[in-house]
């Protein structure tokens, strides 16, 4: 004690030499106690592992009152000894420790000690060795504590800091606790924060922990992004992760939060593989505000993972499109939590069901869900009304508050109620609903999915369409989530108005209603929500009244309402809800404006509509109204938002026949990952058939707006329909009627038609589907036409009348070579339309409904012409779908005569000044499973692979069926398959205005997993612009060095070097299609070709703007079209390449820029490329070289080998218009098609693409060029060429089938 007295003064006084202190030495020596068990008399078995920690009781007791009581206040050592049983001793003996030998000695010592103590011990003796169990602290923590007690020194470590602090507090070592608290201030950094938080889990019950954790969390808030990106973040306990993610102060963007949650989930999943990673991640989704993540990121990065409930993503997209469309509560973490939980429950369910049950925010309580109207329905939609009790959508309106009760009451609504109908989300709306819908009750709202129109009067897309002011209903956009918004998935979907997925639940397969029902429904299309349920993106701009009201008047024939034709078109497939997402900016604003105007007018109109709804109008009038309505959506909406919505919806009714795979083209906006949507659709198709399950892995990040594809099923259906109709005579009694109506209607509202993003109609191509397809096709035409007209209306108002009629006409008469001839007589436009249609008819030809259809709409035939055409068509048997290529060939040959006639007629009507080209709608078939493989596949291979494919027909059908699988292959029509197949898009008319609309599909269809390939089509749609001299649609695909992303070739214009394929596509002001350019007389084939190339409606092109095709991998679709094309436009986009002295003269050059003068209202130069490089063809799977490939339109479409020479193979191809091409026929060939013969050695690109991870980035440069086939090729030539192609294709196909070398 004297030292103790002396020490205090020592600091002040000079060192007192009489006092010697060696505290350091003492500490060092005392450390040996830990390593000398024989010197210790107490052993603590610490933690869960019971690790032994030895100590000296006297020291512990002297330093800590707690230990003194524990060790010396114990009633009897005997009792304590009892705890150290032989088992414990053995444990000590075996327990790992820093000094195993010492442990052994200790064990021996204990053994001897115990033997000595066997007799009752009156008092603890020095020999007695106590063993205590300490469970509160970890071994490392307790060891440090004992070290400090023995030596007075300890090294604090962030990992054990929290434990030591709490232990010091627990055992009364105040100095140590204070030291730890002080150390916390300096030890918290990005590297230690996770360790501190992880340790807090164990000591959360101690008061010291709370203070320390609070400091750590504050640090995390400040450095959120850094902390969330730490690998150690995955080691944190789940509740800690949730705590961090839920903090409002956390300074990290939502995507970073998502990534952190994903990392944690993956780590947890690795350790617990039996738990679905979706469920794991789902626990965090509620804390992530997905609506704050950019749409392109959502679709490119998050959606493809297929881990985040679709509803959440859709709600987020909808919110971005129109914040008003989503109830903020639905975006809030809490509500999302609940919804997520539901979602998780449903995750195993197909997406559609999930949507149904999980309308994300929307989920109402079950009771709510059962809102009186929809009680029977599962329509979650009612739950959707989550925000608005008042609006609980009646089952019908479950999603669409707009026409809530009244609508729901309408028979249509009852149909919604059908238990089967899952409300829009459910997509299984009972067919009866559909049937009910037949009842004209407009009840778009009743339609279960409220028709976007009805739902969102204001939102161009899904906002309740002005049509249905449902004055009482606030626009769905309003706090109440627009039902539309609720994506079918509904769960997470922040209801995006656009999103209004009018999932229309493609309720029961499209035609829950019997095919005949379609006819009925046709009358009441609105009621039966068009599977497409294109969200009426009626632009708010459109007068809400007109559009909205029209919709109402059409008894709920909403834009979305598919118009069923009388012909049976029942789709065997289950309904698939289309998902529409609108462009946030446009939608929101439009919605606002429209809502005010629309609500007032809409209320009035609504009343009228209700009355009208009560009285179904004549089919004709209804059709007319529908058409008018369809057209009505204002152009504003037709803007990206419209496209967006359209993308989600199926071609109006055109594809209604088949279930819609969840049409999810996410925001049509360039950034929006159309591709993602497409991929989703593809995957859905492949995985679920038509399950609305969107492939979560969009072809990774491949962005592409999906064109509504009339799936092969549809083609098949069409064929069947044709057969049926041919038997019955005019296949389209109702079609004619609708046509007429469409024409009339269209004429009126064509101006207002917004372009709809081509409704993506992915249908599983299956046997049953094929049949349905056919039926649907027959019935579809009007709808398609409507939809198309809507889409095209903007671009081609004047043409639209014709187009609408044409679309119907063509749809029904599709592939009527005869019709082509007739058309030539009737009018070039008609011919185009027919040709295009016939293409659609093509069994295999994929059709991008929106694009194509819009063209067909464009080609609406004037009433007078229509009448003539109808008569003519009636005279001719409907063109059969060629099941057999041979049959096709025969038909083609017959067609030659027709072509000749058509040419003559075409010459007469050669250049209808304003007839727009008719491009076939291109449908993308769902990727078949093959697609999922990285190696590029060609459709031909597909055929080869197809089991039992012996005949061309079989190949075609199988191909179709396969398409139903995973690969997203274009269904090629007969020609398209063989010759056209060359082009990325199989659709012969793949693009009329945008050559490459279709081409994207090929790229798109890479394996879902292929993360490296991203194909994004950016819409650079510039509606306002006049036509471009340059065809932006010309697309060249550039290979880009994966590492540097530098163009491998001279790419046009300084493209951003990125993984993106840029479709710098600026649709011409006409809306992408050249409204007034008449096609010169062309042979049908030419036409198809042209269509394929040229006809890409704005939609196709627009979405094309920029897509990171980034490292498209093996997709079959890798652009064969432009391997060398990348260099094709050495000049910037803006400069049409000057024709070369001799396009073929330059040996170094394979692609020769050709400037074609289009004969248009004004001559414009169209830049195209003539590819003489065989490699172009090689780039893709060798495809039969086929002139068909010529995409007259521009763009480097692969030129069939024939073109390689620079001379079109097509005899009929005559130079059209002033074409500065070396060869007269060059114009056709010059279209920049480059393709080599099928058997040429693989091009480097091809070789690279063969590897799963090729390093190319395809940059697809789309140049839009007003290239109407008229300019490029006279109409008659086109027709002739098309026919020729057909014949040739059938031959080639057979040859290829036989000679495929893959």
Swiss-Prot record:
User: What residue stretches are annotated with the BTB domain?
Assistant: 40-158
Record-linked InterPro entries = BACK (IPR011705), BTB-POZ/Galectin-3-binding (IPR051481), BTB/POZ_dom (IPR000210), SKP1/BTB/POZ_sf (IPR011333)
State the Gene3D superfamilies in the record: 1.25.40.420, Potassium Channel Kv1.1, Chain A
Compositionally biased residues, Polar residues: 378-388, 410-430, 437-449, 472-487, 736-748, 1187-1207
Disordered: where is this region? Answer: 325-532, 575-624, 648-685, 701-752, 834-858, 1045-1090, 1102-1163, 1187-1252
Q: Which SUPFAM superfamilies match?
A: POZ domain
Biased composition annotated in UniProt, kind: Basic residues: 337-364
- Bias class Basic and acidic residues marks the residues at 589-623, 713-723, 836-855
Q: What PROSITE patterns does the record tag this protein with?
A: BTB
Pfam families documented for this protein? BACK, BTB
Task: Give residue spans, biased composition: Low complexity.
Answer: 664-680, 1047-1056, 1107-1128, 1226-1252
Q: What is this protein called?
A: Serine-enriched protein
State the organism of origin: Drosophila melanogaster (Fruit fly)
Which gene name belongs to this protein? gprs
């Amino acid at each position: 004690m004297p030292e103790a007295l002396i020490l205090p003064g020592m600091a002040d006084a000079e060192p007192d030499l009489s006092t010697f202190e060696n505290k350091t030495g003492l500490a060092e020596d005392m450390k040996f106690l830990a390593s000398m068990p024989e010197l210790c008399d107490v052993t603590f078995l610490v933690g869960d592992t019971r690790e032994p920690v030895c100590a000296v009781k006297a020291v512990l007791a002297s330093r800590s009152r707690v230990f003194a009581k524990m060790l010396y206040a114990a009633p009897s050592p005997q009792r304590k000894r009892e705890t150290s049983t032989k088992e414990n001793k053995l444990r000590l003996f075996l327990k790992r420790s820093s000094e195993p030998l010492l442990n052994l000695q200790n064990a021996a010592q204990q053994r001897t000690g115990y033997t000595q103590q066997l007799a009752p011990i009156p008092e603890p003796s020095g020999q007695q060795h106590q063993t205590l169990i300490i469970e509160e602290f970890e071994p490392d923590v307790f060891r440090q504590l004992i070290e400090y007690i023995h030596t007075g020194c300890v090294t604090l470590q962030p990992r054990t800091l929290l434990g030591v602090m709490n232990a010091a507090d627990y055992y009364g070592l105040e100095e140590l606790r204070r030291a730890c608290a002080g150390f916390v201030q300096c030890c918290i950094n990005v590297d230690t924060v996770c360790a501190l938080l992880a340790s807090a889990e164990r000591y959360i019950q101690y008061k010291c922990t709370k203070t320390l954790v609070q400091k750590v969390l504050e640090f995390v808030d400040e450095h959120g992004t850094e902390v969330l990106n730490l690998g150690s973040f995955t080691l944190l306990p789940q509740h800690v992760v949730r705590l961090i993610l839920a903090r409002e102060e956390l300074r990290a963007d939502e995507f970073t939060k998502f990534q952190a949650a994903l990392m944690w989930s993956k780590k947890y999943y690795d350790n617990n593989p039996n738990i679905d990673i979706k469920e794991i991640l789902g626990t965090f989704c509620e804390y992530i505000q997905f609506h704050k993540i950019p749409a392109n990121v959502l679709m490119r990065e998050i959606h493809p993972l297929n881990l985040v409930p679709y509803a959440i993503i859709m709600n987020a997209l909808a919110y971005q499109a129109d914040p008003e469309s989503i109830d903020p509560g639905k975006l809030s973490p809490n509500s999302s939590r609940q919804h997520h939980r539901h979602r998780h429950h449903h995750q195993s369910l197909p997406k559609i069901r999930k949507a149904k049950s999980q309308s994300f925010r929307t989920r109402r309580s079950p009771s709510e869900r059962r809102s009186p109207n929809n009680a029977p329905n599962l329509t979650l939609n009612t739950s959707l009304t989550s925000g608005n009790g008042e609006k609980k959508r009646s089952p019908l309106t479950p999603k669409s508050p707009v026409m809530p009760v009244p609508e729901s009451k309408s028979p249509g609504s009852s149909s919604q109620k059908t238990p089967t109908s899952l409300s829009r989300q459910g997509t299984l709306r009972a067919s009866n609903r559909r049937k009910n819908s037949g009842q004209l009750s407009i009840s778009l709202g009743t339609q279960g999915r409220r028709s976007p129109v009805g739902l969102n009067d204001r939102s161009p897309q899904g906002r309740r369409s002005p049509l249905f002011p449902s004055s009482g209903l606030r626009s769905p956009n309003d706090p109440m989530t627009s039902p539309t918004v609720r994506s079918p998935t509904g769960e997470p979907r922040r209801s995006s108005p656009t999103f209004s997925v009018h999932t229309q639940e493609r309720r029961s397969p499209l035609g829950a209603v019997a095919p005949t029902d379609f006819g009925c429904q046709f009358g009441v299309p609105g009621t039966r929500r068009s599977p497409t349920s294109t969200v009426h993106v009626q632009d708010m701009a459109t007068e809400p009244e007109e559009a909205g009201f029209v919709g109402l008047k059409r008894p709920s024939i909403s834009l979305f309402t598919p118009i069923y034709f009388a012909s049976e078109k029942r789709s065997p497939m289950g309904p698939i809800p289309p998902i529409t997402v609108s462009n946030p900016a446009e939608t929101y604003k439009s919605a606002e404006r429209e809502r005010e105007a629309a609500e007032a007018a809409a209320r009035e109109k609504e009343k009228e509509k209700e009355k009208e709804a009560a009285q179904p109008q004549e089919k004709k009038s209804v059709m007319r109204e529908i058409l008018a309505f369809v057209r009505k959506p204002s152009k504003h909406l037709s803007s990206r938002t419209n496209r967006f919505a359209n993308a989600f919806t199926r071609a109006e009714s055109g594809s209604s026949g088949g279930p819609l795979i969840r049409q999810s083209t996410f925001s049509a906006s360039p950034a929006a990952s159309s591709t993602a949507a497409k991929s989703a659709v593809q995957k859905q198709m492949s995985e679920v058939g038509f399950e609305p399950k969107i492939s979560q892995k969009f072809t990774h990040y491949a962005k592409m707006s999906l064109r509504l594809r009339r799936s092969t099923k549809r083609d098949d259906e069409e064929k069947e329909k044709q057969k049926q109709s041919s038997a019955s005579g005019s296949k389209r009694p109702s079609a004619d009627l609708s046509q007429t109506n469409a024409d009339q209607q269209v004429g009126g509202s064509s101006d207002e038609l917004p372009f709809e993003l081509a409704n993506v109609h992915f249908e599983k191509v299956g046997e049953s589907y094929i049949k349905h397809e056919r039926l649907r096709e027959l019935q579809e035409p009007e709808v398609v036409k409507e939809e198309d007209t809507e889409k095209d209306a903007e671009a081609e108002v004047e043409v639209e009348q014709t187009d609408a009629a044409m679309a119907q006409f063509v749809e029904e008469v599709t592939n009527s070579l005869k019709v082509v001839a007739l058309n030539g007589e009737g009018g070039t436009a008609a011919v185009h339309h027919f040709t295009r249609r016939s293409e659609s008819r093509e069994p295999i030809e994929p059709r991008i409904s929106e694009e194509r259809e819009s063209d067909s709409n464009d080609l609406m035939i004037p009433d007078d012409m229509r009448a003539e055409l109808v008569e003519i068509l009636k005279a001719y048997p409907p063109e059969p779908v060629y099941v057999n290529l041979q049959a096709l060939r025969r038909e083609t040959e017959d067609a030659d005569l027709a072509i000749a006639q058509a040419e003559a007629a075409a010459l007469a009507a050669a250049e209808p000044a304003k007839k727009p080209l008719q491009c076939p709608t291109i449908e993308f078939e769902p990727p078949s499973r093959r697609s999922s493989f990285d190696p590029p596949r060609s459709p031909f291979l597909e055929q080869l692979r197809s089991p039992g494919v012996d005949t061309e027909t079989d190949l075609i059908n199988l191909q179709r069926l396969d398409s139903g699988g995973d690969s997203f292959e274009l269904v090629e029509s007969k020609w398209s398959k063989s010759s056209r197949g060359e082009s990325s898009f199989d659709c012969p008319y793949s693009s009329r205005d945008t050559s490459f609309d279709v081409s994207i599909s090929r790229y798109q269809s890479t394996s879902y997993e292929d993360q490296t390939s991203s194909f994004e089509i950016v819409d650079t749609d510039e509606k306002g612009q006049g036509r471009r001299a340059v065809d932006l649609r010309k697309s060249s695909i550039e290979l880009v060095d994966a590492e540097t992303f530098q163009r491998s070739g001279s790419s046009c214009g300084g493209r951003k070097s990125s993984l993106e394929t840029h479709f710098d596509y600026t649709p011409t002001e006409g809306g992408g299609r050249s409204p007034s350019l008449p096609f010169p007389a062309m042979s049908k084939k030419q036409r198809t070709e042209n269509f394929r190339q040229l006809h890409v409606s704005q939609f196709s092109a627009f979405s094309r703007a920029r897509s990171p095709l980034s490292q498209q991998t093996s997709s079959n679709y890798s652009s064969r079209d432009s391997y060398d094309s990348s260099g094709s436009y050495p000049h910037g986009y803006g400069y049409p390449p000057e024709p070369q002295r001799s396009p073929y003269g330059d040996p170094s050059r394979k692609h020769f820029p050709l400037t074609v003068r289009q004969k248009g209202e004004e001559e414009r130069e169209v830049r195209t490329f003539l590819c003489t490089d065989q490699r172009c063809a090689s780039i893709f799977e060798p495809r039969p070289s086929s002139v068909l490939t010529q995409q007259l339109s521009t763009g480097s479409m692969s030129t069939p080998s024939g073109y390689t020479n620079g001379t079109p193979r097509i005899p009929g191809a005559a130079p059209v218009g002033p074409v500065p091409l070396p060869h007269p026929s060059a114009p056709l060939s010059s279209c920049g098609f480059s393709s080599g013969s099928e058997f040429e050695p693989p091009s480097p690109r091809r070789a690279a693409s063969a590897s799963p991870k090729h390093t190319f980035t395809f940059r697809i440069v789309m140049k839009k060029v007003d290239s109407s086939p008229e300019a490029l090729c006279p109409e008659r030539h086109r027709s002739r060429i098309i026919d020729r192609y057909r014949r040739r294709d059938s031959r080639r196909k057979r040859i290829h089938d036989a000679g495929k070398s893959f």
